[in-house]
Amino acid sequence: MANQLILLKKDFFTDEQQAVTVADRYPQDVFAEHTHEFCELVMVWRGNGLHVLNERPYRITRGDLFYIRAEDKHSYTSVNDLVLQNIIYCPERLKLNVNWQAMIPGFQGAQWHPHWRLGSMGMNQARQVINQLEHESNGRDPLANEMAELLFGQLVMTLKRHRYATDDLPATSRETLLDKLITALANSLESSFALDAFCQQEQCSERVLRQQFRAQTGMTINQYLRQVRICHAQYLLQHSPLMISEISMQCGFEDSNYFSVVFTRETGMTPSQWRHLSNQSD
């Protein structure tokens, strides 16, 4: 695409030897679709927003982790106090003898699964390493680049150790109620979610959990679940031949008319209009 925005190495790296650096987004504003001359890891700390990656929408919030390749197209819209960090790196500049392909999904042709989650424990450990990495990447002493790359290696290993699929928090996990709740919501795309039953199972206060969720994500629990379902519906409308009534069922809406009302309110167009517009742009 001739008018595609491309983020350039020279605007982010201090010199041609620097392999990795950190770009803070406190907060992340709306950002038009773009690609890069480099790769990046995206770590979401707080708030929420709509992250569209290669035309697939994701409603993101605390704990979301993305592995972005240079050629990937992505953008940020509908942001609400969204705080994240981009750890950006140039694969060809990495010198450390590490099996990067085993650590980073999509690294130089490795199998790519872009979207993961981190629980609170993983986030805390990653944040400590990122803070050190940011300090070294801004350093000017002769060993700063080498130290930054060592810390990057530690970071990608930490992320691999703690990441999990969005709907599959390990049964042995010691993560917080908030992490368990977000995983439970991801497992409720096609069925109703009963918060009272969840709280009874976890022996926690429903009122306190609602407050914690809103404080960390900027949304209510129902708003988040609705947004996740609508994102899934957008993807199915564009990439599957399913009828709208079938998509409605797969996204937790038993009434297709109600689904259309909610979809239109959230996106500004009907499901049919979305599908038509998406097919035109393909």
Curated annotation (Swiss-Prot):
Keyword Signal attached: no
Keywords: Activator, Cytoplasm, DNA-binding, Repeat, Rhamnose metabolism, Transcription, Transcription regulation
Record's subcellular location: Cytoplasm
Chain positions of site Interaction with sigma-70: E246
GO cellular component, one term: cytoplasm
Entry-linked SMART domains: HTH_ARAC
Portion annotated as DNA-binding: 196-217, 244-267
GO MF annotation list: DNA-binding transcription factor activity; sequence-specific DNA binding
InterPro entries: AraC-bd, Homeodomain-like_sf, HTH_AraC, HTH_AraC-typ_CS, RhaR_RhaS-like_N, RmlC-like_jellyroll, RmlC_Cupin_sf, Tscrpt_act_RhaR
Keyword DNA-binding: yes
Gene Ontology BP term (one): rhamnose metabolic process
NCBIfam families: PRK13500.1, PRK13501.1, PRK13502.1
Subunit: Binds DNA as a dimer.
General function of this protein: Activates expression of the rhaSR operon in response to L-rhamnose.
Protein's recorded name: HTH-type transcriptional activator RhaR
Gene: rhaR
